């Protein structure tokens, strides 16, 4: 195993454990929405997609997260509006990630989205 792959493994385990042990607030019922969010900044090679994916699963959101060729990350997040806003706020609070800009666009809810995946 190379040093780089060992580092990635350590980082991924750290991210998974952080999300697993995160004390989530209690959420009231809220309107189901779907957003496409483009995150710019230091968002690739820092465990960003993994963190979004793991937290989205804990929040029972559906959608996906993927790297874009220009260095940004695009996420489609679907679920209760308050849970989506919590996920975005949480990601903005992380020190190892630096979101310099985010662009949110509301999309039509997609009833065929049944899970959250990292692409």
Give the ranges of each region predicted by the language model:
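Intrinsically disordered, low-complexity, mixed-charge
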Residues: 1-119
